[in-house]
A protein has these predicted regions:
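General beta-strand structural signal in soluble alpha/beta enzymes
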Residues: 1, 45-46, 72-73, 101-105, ...
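Active-site-proximal loop->helix
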Residues: 31-42
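Active-site phosphate-binding strand-loop segment of PLP-dependent enzymes
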Residues: 53-108, 123
Length: 200
């Protein structure tokens, strides 16, 4: 129960054991950096020129230093309309199998094709109020096995957005969560996903 920003915080805080490389093409990329630094997560920001995407070369140059174990990228930057070339970035990330990839897809998930598993995205964050066409108030994310395993090496994951704690609770107890869920939006999303599947 939060906006997408909450799970962005959960992603970078739960998955960064060493240092995060944050790639910004606008306001929401800058938000990744603000979240990381506000939570004491060591991080560096790599900005593109206004209206330009994060390039695979930028990602490769940063990761080749060996300083980073997490990268944060905005898929579709609402403030500029730039959509990052995630297919090409995914190819670069194959060279760095230990790096956890966190993606803000708040304004694109359910509106753009994002093959999370094929691309190798470890944590994809979205929320209900954009392409899912639901009221705001609930964020959802994917969590890869690699990202889950990484969380074990991060000592200060926080409480409310501790992805490991949330995942473990859901796996152990049906219909139980670490915090009070937004049940009304969960029902609405269930219906909306059924409608999407029927339409194809």
């Amino acid at each position: 129960t939060s906006s997408g920003t909450g799970l962005m915080e959960g992603a970078v805080r739960s998955c960064t054991a060493k240092r995060a490389a944050i790639f910004s093409v606008g306001a929401f990329g800058d938000k990744w950096y603000k979240i990381a630094t506000g939570n004491g997560v060591p991080s560096d920001i790599f900005k593109s020129e206004l209206g330009q995407p994060t390039t695979p070369e930028m990602v490769d140059a940063a990761l080749s230093t060996g300083k980073y174990d997490t990268i944060c990228i905005t898929h579709n930057e609402t403030s500029t309309g730039v959509q990052n070339p995630v297919e090409e970035i995914a190819e670069v990330l194959k060279k760095y199998p230990d790096v956890v990839w966190c993606m803000d897809a708040v304004s694109s998930a359910a509106g753009s094709r994002i093959e999370t598993d094929r691309l190798g995205v470890d944590v994809l964050v979205t929320s209900t109020q954009k392409a899912l066409a639901l009221p705001p108030g609930m964020a959802v994310c994917t969590l890869s096995q690699k990202a889950y395993e990484r969380t074990a090496s991060v000592p200060n994951r926080g409480c409310y957005f501790d992805l490991r704690s949330i995942y473990d609770t859901i796996q152990k107890k049906d219909y139980q969560y670490t915090n009070t869920p937004c049940v009304s939006i969960m029902y609405a999303m269930d219906l909306q996903l059924q409608r999407i599947m029927q339409e194809g």
